[in-house]
From Swiss-Prot:
Domain of life: Bacteria
Name by which UniProt lists this protein: Probable potassium transport system protein Kup
Family named by the database record: Belongs to the HAK/KUP transporter (TC 2.A.72) family.
Segments crossing the lipid bilayer: 24-44, 67-87, 115-135, 153-173, 181-201, 228-248, 263-283, 301-321, 353-373, 382-402, 413-433, 435-455
GO molecular function: potassium ion transmembrane transporter activity; symporter activity
Organism field: Azoarcus sp. (strain BH72)
Keyword Transcription regulation: no
Amino acid sequence: MQVEHEVATEGGQAPASSGHRKGIAGLAVAAIGVVYGDIGTSPLYTLKEVFNGPHAVPVNEANVYGILSLVFWALVTVVSAKYVVFITRADNRGEGGIMALTSLALRVVQPGRRAWWLSVLGVFGAALFYGDGMITPAISVLSAVEGLEVATPAFKPFVIPIALVVLVGLFVMQRRGTGSVGAIFGPVMVCWFLVLAVLGINGITLHPEIIGALDPRWAARFFIDQPLIGWLALGAVVLAITGGEALYADMGHFGRRPIKLAWFSLVFPALYLNYLGQGALILDHPDNVRNPFYMLVPDALVYPMVGMATLATIIASQAVISGAFSLTRQAIQLGYAPRMQTLHTSEHEIGQIYVPGVNWMLLGAVVALVVGFQSSSALASAYGIAVTLTMMIDTVLAFVVVRSLWKWGRAKAVLFLVVFLAVDIAFFSATTVKIFAGGWFPLLIGAAIFTLLRTWKRGRSLLNERIRSDTMPLDIFIQSMFQSPPPRVEGTAVFMTTWLDGVPRALLHNLIHNKVLHERVVLLRVDTADVPHVPEGERVEVEEIDYGFYRVRVHYGFKDDPDIPAALGLCAQRGLPFDMMETSFFLGRETLVSRVGSGMPQWREKLFILLFRNAGSAADYFCIPPNRVVELGTQVEL
């Protein structure tokens, strides 16, 4: 069951908890440090890949102008128009991201086949994020450290070891959180974008006419004259917009206005000035295509620039890693993933979490990518395909929102879909040529994560149906208590359950084995709403039944942290006070047994049982004191 009190708006604003405490300029600076790290490090490798990659575009004036025009209009169409102007208006109580967008789309669709497909799309888009999250740190840090080769070729053997040291250090430090250094991310990235702009302007002086590349006719002519080369080039041009989808995912931290201000006032101009500078440099010295970004840097400043670029890529990688932690928590809350150990790394910022299992999975994959691909150019072949797929999914989900939730007219909504989906498909089709060169990796990771998420969701549904079919109705149970009442003992017993109208198995087992009931018996259900946060005033519902029995329903948003003792503390306002020292929590611990005809293929059934056995403790996940927990085992045929 979901809480139906949320309000969807067209036009996301900064969350009240942050937007009213900080000025919009301060939030914009903070957003630059988190939201734009990924796209902000794209100049390190984008044009190098275009003119020096496996499908290298020949260097001549028409081609350089055409590519720069493509980059500009990709940034305008995909990032500026689609994400900054349109999709960021689709906020779910101030929150963004593909989970929030999926929730908005499902809210206006009747249950059925269409809703199922939208749900599948949303989950697949979320799964693709993990593949992207593995490649981003690897390609970003590698491309930064490769600047040492520009300073002197003698550093070439040390690039991989240095990159690995940086990356391993980054993941090892996750346990400590970023609270102590997070405040400097914004100012550091502001400096980074200012440096990008200055380097770009310096390069533009070599060929001032390069500014004419803003004319879309250059891009059109490039495609008309060389359609195949133009199409293949899109597979590298897409690197300029990777990370654009992140600005919507992080909207909940800063709000729409600061993200929009940061993009149009600094990030977009700085990025494109740098691309123009690199283009001018390539026209002036075609040999510079081997690393046009670092060739823009004066010789005396190459080493400091490598240091600054490495710091910028660390910040960009941190945003992706934190995003993976946050997405995992949302998946757990929404019932798509088993419980995992989740640690808070800050006493002040509730959103700063650390998920050890995800952290080490990402580290292992990142190290394998760096060792396996050896260079940022090789990694570029694996990059982009997952991002473009995610962007296509965002467009489809956004179309449902603008048509059904915002009530746009059919013509206007279809125009939105056709324009942006055409651009997305063009980029995606161009990246498909990378599949055998490395693009298979994020697709494989995405497919694997998607399978895990859907298997867990389906398995939990089947398990709940099985338990439900064997559950005794609560009213019949209470009537039997009147006929032959068992002894009552002091205190309160809390039984967590999925159905408040049935008797939890743990309650029956306790009664059968211990022959007693507590003075107060509380049946507690936890619901996750399709909104990011549920206000404290709407956290709990209490219903007194009879014979000392109570029903308590606790509501959380998909970005809230479940804390059952804290929630029960709110029940006093509803006439049901709790004393934790007099309260025992009875949790059922099921042992699953496979059977024929369970409703899932045998391999998925075995996978679900494996996931179930390794799921984290319910007591830990719900912050229940271990010394107040009683676990009662039961066997269930799946």
